[in-house]
Amino acid sequence: MTKSLGYISLGCAKNLVDTEVMLGLLKDDGYTITDNLYEADLIIINTCTFIEKAKEESINTILEAAQYKETGRCKGLIVAGCLSQQYQDELFTEIPEIDALIGTGAWDQVMVAVDAIEHGNRSCIMENITNIYDERMPRIQTTPRYSAYVKIAEGCNNGCTFCIIPKVRGAFRSRSIESIKAEVERLAASGVKEIVLIAQDTTSYGIDLNNGKPLLTELLKELTKVEGIEWIRMLYLYPTFFSDELLDIIVNEPKLCKYVDIPLQHVNNNILKQMNRRDSREDIERLLKKIRNAPTHVTLRTSIIVGFPGETDEQFQELCEFVKDIKFDNMGVFTYSQEEGTIAGAREDQIPEEVKEERYHTLMSIQAAISEENNRDLEGTIDYAMIEELEEGDNDTVLAKGRLKSQAPDVDGNMYIEDCGDKVKPGDIVQVQVEQGFAYDVVATIVE
């Protein structure tokens, strides 16, 4: 009898990779994947606990999935990921519908959990937080066939005072260059054209393998040799180890997207110190100046936290002026989330929620105007774009949706071609001219 598997993966792309590996292991055991949770014999929820809203979403998703034990075919509910790692006792006690909990380093034990369910037992598998997958693990790609995430490291050593990740993901540990390259070669052979390299701290890649010195540029040099891969993109480039050598290869290697995602979180020196960030405002300014002065334009993305404990109006205004001055191409803004088990979470000078929300909307409004200005500056320029979706428009036209080489999947805006006819299909990389720029998206035409 065919066994069906339903899943929901929450949180970041790093979590999604863990989900894809678990799906691969279950498929090897005979499960078929269904998009309809009502029809699933087994349901896996891979959870996130990074901020309070992520916790709430995870819990609500678990409760919704638990209903399929009564209304659907579900005979086993497995909850994996960061929420499981952090709140295992509470989850098992308060949600009895959960059959198994799998920690962040125990994704490769998913079949042990399934076996326990089949024997009528509940299980909680939390050991081996030092684990990391490699190229030998089966993996079911859930992203479009032409684009895939590749996790090059796991865990984090930075110890930011607002963040729970080191406690739930463990110490920083890198995969070998050989393992990553072998996986990328396999992905390329399956039709992947774009790889997105991810880690909690991507620029620190290799420090645990090379006496404290990063190996990211060495990794990139090897990955550019893989035939079939046309775009290589990196996310989560922590500023401390962002070297001149790394900038040089980004600028000069054709396969590398001229795209830099640097999570700065803040720029006020007192706030940065209280966050336990290694870089000062002056360090940040020097780095961004180098990137802005590069011989080729490099798209800049960052993420910012507003409402950190003790953040004054003056410190927030300093942040706003900095954003106006740098003019980031893309920016994610988060309101500070008071997390249990963190140093910042224990502070008494928490900012009221209404103040955090006001600061969030203020900064997002500033960035929207900057993004629109930057996108308008793209009008008339030529770039490469990846086609992702086609849909019927008015008067028998075909609308194409995709991304410029300067736009990352899931987090940035989109590129639209209003009438592409039958010239393109999903996965194609084509040359386009930007015709109109808006706050987050652009409209383009294909260059014949």
Residue ranges and their predicted role:
Residues 12, 206-224, 228, 274-275, ...:
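Radical SAM enzyme [4Fe-4S]-AdoMet core and its adjacent flexible, acidic
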Residues 1-205, 245, 256, 260, ...:
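Proteins enriched for Cys/Gly/acidic motifs involved in redox and nucleic-acid/cofactor modification
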Residues 76-79, 86, 91, 189-314:
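Conserved SAM/AdoMet-binding glycine-rich loop
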Residues 53, 172-179, 211-215, 276-283, ...:
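Alpha-helix N-cap and loop-to-helix initiation/capping positions
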Residues 8, 80, 198-200, 235-237, ...:
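Generic beta-strand/beta-sheet core signal
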Residues 346-448:
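Terminal RNA-binding accessory module
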